[in-house]
């Protein structure tokens, strides 16, 4: 059986990166929430 997590830096950046987050309204809310929490890393 193939495992579900097949790491790829490119896919990770494209799906969960900062620019991907900023490109949607919901993503901007995610970044804002993580800023409010004081997260060291905002996105992948």
From Swiss-Prot:
PANTHER family: LARGE RIBOSOMAL SUBUNIT PROTEIN BL34M (PTHR14503:SF4), MITOCHONDRIAL RIBOSOMAL PROTEIN 34 FAMILY MEMBER (PTHR14503). Keywords: Ribonucleoprotein, Ribosomal protein. One of its GO terms (cellular component) is ribonucleoprotein complex. Residues 1-44 are annotated as: Disordered. The keyword Ribosomal protein applies. It comes from the Bacteria. InterPro entries: Ribosomal_bL34, Ribosomal_bL34_CS. The gene is rpmH. Belongs to the bacterial ribosomal protein bL34 family. GO terms for molecular function: structural constituent of ribosome. GO terms for biological process: translation. Residues 10-19, 26-44 have a biased composition (Basic residues). The keyword Chaperone does not apply. This is Large ribosomal subunit protein bL34.
